[in-house]
Structure formats: C-alpha cells, structure tokens
From Swiss-Prot:
Belongs to the thioester dehydratase family. FabZ subfamily. InterPro entries: FabA_FabZ (IPR013114), FabZ (IPR010084), HotDog_dom_sf (IPR029069). The keyword Lipid metabolism applies. Its EC number is 4.2.1.59. The gene is fabZ. It comes from Rickettsia massiliae (strain Mtu5). It catalyses: a (3R)-hydroxyacyl-[ACP] = a (2E)-enoyl-[ACP] + H2O. This is 3-hydroxyacyl-[acyl-carrier-protein] dehydratase FabZ.
Amino acid sequence: MIIDITEIMDWIPHRYPFLLVDRVLKIDPNKSITGIKNVTVNEPQFTGHFPARPVMPGVLMVEAMAQLAAILVAKSLGSTKNKEVFLMAIENAKFRRIVQPGDTMHIHVVIDQQRANVWKFSSTVTVEGEIAAESKFTAMIKDKA
C-alpha cells in the first residue's frame, strides 16, 4: 500500500519544514513500514549544516524514523486523531554514511515490542543500498489533552 504526502499529513501532525517523510512504500500494520525522504538542497537545515558541504543532520534522520513509526502506530490502531505520539528514548543511534542533497533515504521501521501505550522500534535508513543510520527508539501514545 503506497501512501502519498497528502495522506501522510492526515496521519501525522508534522508540516514543512519538519515533515520528513515523503511517501510510504509498504506498510504491514502491527509489524513494519517502509518509506522514503527525498533530500533536497532547499531544505532549511542546509543553510547552516554545512554551507560549503550540505550534510543531513543525524538527528533529522532519527526524526524521520520516528515520524514513520508514528504513521505505523496510527495505521495499526486505525486512527490517532485523539492521540499523540511522543518519542521517549533513543538507543544505539549510529550514523554510518553521509546523506546529502540529491539522496533518497529509504527508511524501514519494525515494531519490536508493544505493551499498553509504550511501543519499541528498530529502524534503518539506507541510501543506494548502504546503511546510513540505524537506531532503536521508544514512543508513548497518549490521549490528547
């Protein structure tokens, strides 16, 4: 099931310049999700990171993983309209390859565990078949206030 940017914005609250998922390529609710982020030079982080050699910040790669996980949670639950997904912990984040404008990040997220409102994930970002980043992280789902 492919999910385009319009539907992505129905599932998560993020918007430009902080929406970091362009398309969902595959989703298996309660299991895994794969999506992409096309990295372009006109994104605001590249004005300072770094002007002479733009490099995608590692924390934004982890944020893209977390946003894709939020879509997976929403699709697994059927809706998160009255809920919010909060990142609680990031573990073992590793950055193995520079990601720069022109690259397409392929992001894969797997649910490792889910207990009540706490979900644990593992994720990788690949570019041209090479691992660029990997991380484990935990998120909490809460009712909106």
